[in-house]
Amino acid sequence: MNTDLLVTTTEHIPGKEYEVIGEVFGLTTQSKNVLRNMGAALKNVVGGEIKDYTKMLDEARNISVDRLRKNARDMGADAVVMMRFDSGSIGTDMQSVAAYGTAVKYV
């Protein structure tokens, strides 16, 4: 994970003045293989955490933030403020995660 560009969920960066460049996104869609899906279906019957899907979502969030950073850097940004996540299912075995925020340039 590349962390050289600040990404924060806050609106302000203490001690920094900046101008807004624009909105920025990082997206990914992940899926599990058929065998893992069968294991998840069995776990769904008995209840409890489906660790493979938890791991997949964690990886998807990390990938989406990495892509957000790259896209912000490509826009000439120094940081991203007001970062948020959105996620949703595609079919029964895919998950899409978006990291989005406002790209800013220090003045």
Swiss-Prot record:
InterPro entries on file: UPF0145_dom_sf, UPF0145_YbjQ-like
Membrane-crossing residue ranges in chain numbering: none
Top-level taxon of the source organism: Bacteria
A Pfam family matched in the record: YbjQ_1
Family: Belongs to the UPF0145 family.
Protein name stated in the entry: UPF0145 protein LVIS_1527
Taxonomic lineage of the native organism: Bacteria, Bacillati, Bacillota, Bacilli, Lactobacillales
